[in-house]
């Protein structure tokens, strides 16, 4: 930990610097690979919607010693068409999910389960969701997502600047797209718990991005007036100054989510925990990546296209004080912008005592 603390101090002071902004094409290429894989997964496999969204019937039997194969065989004997999903929940529960059934078919499934497992029909937890209700839930979930993005974009545009809002939304869409693609790849059901997980990672990704952008705004406030360094150089220092904090926060967030995913869902077989924890785990990891490697470089790309910033980059290059970030791939060069020194409460003038 002392080594990590020392690295954080060197990154903050500028003694050590990683060229996050200058290597933007490398980060974009990595994201492009994951996005293409997500597109392929969505096109080939698609999302496996739960019965809450597409409609269907769910039957949960609570009895120790029952197996998935036995439950699947008992329902297959009824002659149900379509996909039948059987999940083991813990040691004593089995959940059977089917498509939309008529009342006669539903009663036949319940009767088959009572005969196969020797239980009372009242002990079977039956849930039937109509297709129209599932479509309504899907529509409301999409409306909520779009409303969230619009409100966040307006807030960031007013609190920071419009281009920061654009970069933050690009990072959020990047996170959601990759998370949804991995979800389609592993084949987990998309349930209301999954939607909650998606909305949660949107909030976390924006939170981490806003912290980085706040430091970027501080470092670039008077970058054109000073004229000693480019916008990308100032933004790169801001990323270096916040990366250790982002890594620590993300690690602390991932540890409990990982324990829920691998222990709670993997060993105990809790379906709801699995749906929620997988979305959170992937989203937190991807959100941390985008807040460092996607949002700041994309913001720098937008700002460096401005005529004022292009003129600033030419002035800096002509002086020969330090080359613009785009022209160098060094990861250990000391940046020309330095954080404020001799500031803070310890360095303030002391008040004289009253006589």
Predicted regions and their residues:
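A structural signal for conserved, well-ordered secondary-structure elements
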Residues: 1-355
